[in-house]
């Protein structure tokens, strides 16, 4: 189990103070720090303040009362120390021992940088590893606001050496963190890289979701298109039936018109040649027989009159039969029903076409969003590559400047990156250089 005492410091300007207060006092929920368990935030406590203080107004008041000269707008007004230990060791301590660890750390800071300069000592119990934020104003003994003079490079190196020794004297079994292979929380460049990697992952998830959505929308479009095609086929069949029936109706109208022309509009008397008579001869006893003409009730017609009469009767018979058939099959009603079906299908297809048009528009919009996300992901990846290159350059330049002190400086960087898991790119550059040097050496051999 690692047992490293961890302390690192970061400087802030007045414009940063409000954000520091919000984080320390859990004012609102952080979207970037996923390690915070807000159900445990009630367990957090401040060793110096019973009530929450306002960082900015407190700092301004201290500067007004204690600092001789008015500071510049970009002056460092707050130096915040983060104090903890290796996660395994920290969790092995009881709550009482954890509190004593933080109280001892606070006592160490106050003795070193002044009790009057110490504004807060906020202990966070709601993250992965318990730790404490100690806010110190960099006011010197001669009442100057100068983080540069108070926290020199020599002082920071000494701090990393003295803090573990102090904690051991207080009864804690801890060592200096130099040489640790742990992965740590980065300062500004590393934190930005971590945030960008998280954002890239989130955008990749969104991109995957949008791809799925595009496929689903495409399938819906295909189904809608197939449905509309079937509806169009049905409509065409009904239209053909409608045209066929309309043609039959027109033909029947023509037949009716022909028969109507053959049938008089008004009752007519049939012409005939004469009435048929029968001659009766009555014999008498005396005289001539009596001859009489009696009507039989029949009529005598010519052949032409008979032909005309037959045609009219036949036409009437045909009209009667068609009329009786129409009583059973109402072509008018059938035609009206087909018209209504045709209208309904036309309205349905019109609505489906509108839905299809909307789906095509939605699909194009999703493709545009997907394209934009792809571009943004590429930009973020390029930004990450730039950060990695900057770290590489920083490593090389730092090595040139510090030379003999480089090992101590590298140890300082490691300790300053000791809160949450993130790749230590600075150390990676060192390891890569060692391996490259070893590889060249092996090739020479």
Curated annotation (Swiss-Prot):
Please report any disulfide bonds recorded for this protein chain, giving both cysteine positions: none
Domain of life of the native organism: Bacteria
Q: Which UniProt keywords apply?
A: DNA-binding, Plasmid
A single GO molecular-function term is:
DNA binding
Look up keyword rRNA processing and say if it applies.
no
* Binding site residues for DNA: 45, 113
Keyword Signal present in the record's keywords: the answer is: no
Quick one: a GO biological-process term for this protein?
A: DNA recombination
Q: Where is the signal peptide?
A: none
Membership in a protein family? Belongs to the plasmid mobilization pre family.
NCBIfam families, alphabetically? MobV
Please give the name of this protein: Plasmid recombination enzyme
**Organism (species):** Bacillus thuringiensis
């Amino acid at each position: 189990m690692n047992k490293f005492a961890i302390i690192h410091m970061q400087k802030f300007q007045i414009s940063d103070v409000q954000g520091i207060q919000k984080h320390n006092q859990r004012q609102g929920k952080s979207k970037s720090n996923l390690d915070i368990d807000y159900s445990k935030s009630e367990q957090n406590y401040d060793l110096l303040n019973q009530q929450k203080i306002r960082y900015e107004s407190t700092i301004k008041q201290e500067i007004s009362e204690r600092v001789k000269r008015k500071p510049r707008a970009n002056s460092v007004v707050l130096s915040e120390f983060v104090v903890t230990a290796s996660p395994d060791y920290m969790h092995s301590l009881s709550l009482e021992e954890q509190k004593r660890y933080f109280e001892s750390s606070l006592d160490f800071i106050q003795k070193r940088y002044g009790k009057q300069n110490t504004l807060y000592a906020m202990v966070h119990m709601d993250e992965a590893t318990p730790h404490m934020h100690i806010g110190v104003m960099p006011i010197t003994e001669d009442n100057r606001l100068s983080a540069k003079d108070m926290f020199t490079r020599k002082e920071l190196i000494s701090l990393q050496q003295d803090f573990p020794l102090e904690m051991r004297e207080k009864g804690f079994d801890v060592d200096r963190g130099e040489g640790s292979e742990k992965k740590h929380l980065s300062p500004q460049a590393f934190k930005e890289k971590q945030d960008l990697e998280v954002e890239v992952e989130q955008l990749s998830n969104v991109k995957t979701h949008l791809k799925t959505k595009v496929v689903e929308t495409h399938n819906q479009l295909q189904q809608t298109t197939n449905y509309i095609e079937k509806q169009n086929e049905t409509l065409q069949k009904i239209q053909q039936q409608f045209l066929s029936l309309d043609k039959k109706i027109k033909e029947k109208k023509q037949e009716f018109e022909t028969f109507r022309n053959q049938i008089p509009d008004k009752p007519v008397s049939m012409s005939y040649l004469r009435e048929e008579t029968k001659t009766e001869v009555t014999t008498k006893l005396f005289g001539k027989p009596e001859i009489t003409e009696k009507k039989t009730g029949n009529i005598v017609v010519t052949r032409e009159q008979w032909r005309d009469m037959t045609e009219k009767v036949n036409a009437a018979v045909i009209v009667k039969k068609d009329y009786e058939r129409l009583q059973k099959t109402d072509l008018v009603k059938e035609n009206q029903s087909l018209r209504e079906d045709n209208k309904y299908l036309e309205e349905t297809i019109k609505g489906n076409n509108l839905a299809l048009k909307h789906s095509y528009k939605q699909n194009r919009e999703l493709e545009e969003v997907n394209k934009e996300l792809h571009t943004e992901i590429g930009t973020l990846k390029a930004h990450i590559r730039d950060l990695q290159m900057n770290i590489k350059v920083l490593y090389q330049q730092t090595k040139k400047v510090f030379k003999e002190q480089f090992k101590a400086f590298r140890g300082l960087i490691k300790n300053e990156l000791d809160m949450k898991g993130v790749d230590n790119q600075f150390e990676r550059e060192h390891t890569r250089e060692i391996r490259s040097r070893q590889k060249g050496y092996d090739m020479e051999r």
